[in-house]
A protein has these predicted regions:
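Extreme N-terminal starter segment of soluble prokaryotic enzymes
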Residues: 1-5
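Short hydrophobic segments within beta-strands
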Residues: 6-7, 222
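Conserved N-proximal alpha/beta basic substrate-recognition cap immediately N-terminal to
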Residues: 10-25, 31-141
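Phosphate-binding site of ATP-dependent enzymes
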Residues: 23, 160-256
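Short acidic-glycine loop/turn motifs at beta-strand connectors
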Residues: 49-51, 59-60, 221-225, 233, ...
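Loop-centered beta-sheet repeat module
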Residues: 130-184
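C-terminal active-site "lid" helix and adjoining low-complexity regulatory extension at the edge
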Residues: 255-265, 269-276, 285-341
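Nucleotide-cofactor and metal-assisted catalytic machinery
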Residues: 282
Length: 341
């Protein structure tokens, strides 16, 4: 029986259990590693002795061997080492967190089995700048862009785009003020905003030309399978710039969309460049029918779209993990280490 390791956390959504159930139907054994409980409730050990490598995951009296897993799905590592601040003195926290990350991600990098996407490849995707350079190199349209912490450069960019510009962060995060979460969304920026832009010096932002939208696309790629959905975000005023502001309102408004073959092939080549088998891609279709690539997210959400097609995406993830469906990229490893079975 093949074993599949899923890296996630206790507050992840329903997709984990749906994929796990699909894996079990294919006669696989699922090991779920909730990394928010590591290291307080989990122990992770990698040992080399007598010419053999062994990896053990211990949790509540149960020991799992990881050196013999057939595949890994690195879903997310949110809240890694949650609660550590309650048991360690503040002066040790930074060092401990560093060692925890090194141990977990070092173990994952050293697992010579199929992985839908390696952590190192996903970290490469953190560079929105490289994403756009690669996408444009593949022939995809990308918006005019300026990534800067220079207020003067930002002013020049906005003034050069009188039809409109937007400002957004390169990473997803929220600001907590008086215990309330404030998600940072994409916003329109005009010359009127430029008088208050001096604080940009302390935190870079990404500025782009404002693309008029006929449709917004979310494309989920798993192996060779491409699932494309479209939404008319312009029907709701508060969703026109960033549809996530009205994500719940638009939840049932997404429809399957036939992506042009030329665009599909370029997106698959993008996956090959990054050597990954999962990606969630955002694209704008303008009124002239032109496709503008915005970004690819290595762990982009898909569950609300999965519901619209009776769980086909989750089923495909399970099949790709087990080699029951075509894999877009399979690693070639030289000098395989010897693992104890």
């Amino acid at each position: 029986m093949k074993k599949v390791l899923i890296i996630t956390h206790t507050r992840d959504n329903e997709c984990i259990e749906i994929v796990s159930e699909n894996l079990r139907k294919l006669d696989a054994r699922v090991i779920r590693f909730n990394v928010d409980l590591y290291p307080l409730e989990y122990s992770l050990s990698t040992c080399y002795q007598d010419g053999q490598w062994q990896i053990f995951l211990d949790h509540k009296g149960t020991r799992e061997t990881l050196h013999d897993v057939a595949a890994v799905w690195y879903r997310r590592s949110h809240n890694l080492a949650d609660g550590l601040n309650k048991v360690l003195e503040p002066e040790y926290l930074s060092s401990a967190h560093g060692e925890i990350r090194q141990t977990l991600f070092g173990m994952l990098e050293g697992l010579h089995c199929f992985q839908i996407g390696r952590f190192s490849q996903y970290r490469r995707l953190d560079s929105k700048e490289e994403q756009m350079k690669i996408a444009s190199g593949l022939g995809l349209k990308v918006p005019d862009t300026c990534i800067t912490n220079s207020p003067e450069e930002a002013r020049r960019f906005v003034q050069a785009h009188p039809a409109g510009a937007i400002a957004k962060m390169q990473s997803s995060f929220a600001i907590y003020r008086e215990g309330v979460e404030h998600v940072v969304f994409t916003n329109v920026i005009t010359e009127d905003n430029l008088d208050t832009i001096e604080t940009l010096q302390y935190c870079p932002m990404q500025f782009q030309e404002k693309i008029e939208k006929a449709r917004e696309l979310r494309i989920t790629i798993v192996g060779d399978a491409v699932y494309c959905f479209a939404v008319d975000s312009q029907r709701i005023e508060n969703a026109k710039v960033d549809w996530r502001r009205e994500g719940l309102e638009l939840l049932e408004q997404w429809d399957p969309y036939e992506l042009p073959e030329e665009i599909k092939e370029k997106l698959l080549r993008l996956m090959d460049v990054y050597q990954i088998n999962y990606g969630a891609i955002d694209i704008i279709v303008n009124p002239e029918g032109e496709y503008y690539f915005l970004e690819i997210n290595s762990a982009g959400e898909y569950f609300w779209l999965d519901r619209l097609i009776q769980g086909q995406i989750s089923e495909q993830i399970a099949k790709v993990l087990l080699g029951e469906a075509p894999r877009r990229f399979q690693p070639i490893t030289l000098g395989e280490p010897t693992f104890s079975m």
